[in-house]
Amino acid sequence: MKAMKATKKAMTKTGLAEALAPKPSSARRIAPPSSRAWPPSAQEVKKTGKLIIPGLVMVKTRKKPATKAGKREMFGKVVLVKAQPAKTVVKAYPVKALKDNF
């Protein structure tokens, strides 16, 4: 799998804080921080291919190439495999600071 090339600069800590800050228009409904974080995070990953939430997680996208249909040997048996289209895979990794705490 190849890493996607960043098209724009990644979001900074300040930009992330501003995206997660409650907006004045949303004063009527109280939403948990996780639901407020999702739309800006998804947009950032689509735009740059990478998102780091400091101290918690790093989210990266990878391009997985298409596979051809055919026969493959698995555990001594021949298995027919369907062709799969190319796709983008999103993976999340814990950052070092989180790993060190456990």
Swiss-Prot record:
Comp. bias regions, Basic residues: 1-11
Protein's recorded name: Major basic nuclear protein 2
GO cellular component, as recorded: nucleus
Highest taxon of the lineage: Eukaryota
GO molecular function: DNA binding
Chain's gene name: HCc2
Compartments where found: Nucleus
Keyword terms of this UniProt record: DNA-binding, Nucleus
Renumbered residue ranges of the record's region Disordered: 1-43
Predominant location: nucleus
The keyword Repressor appears for this protein: no
Ranges annotated as biased composition (Low complexity): 21-42
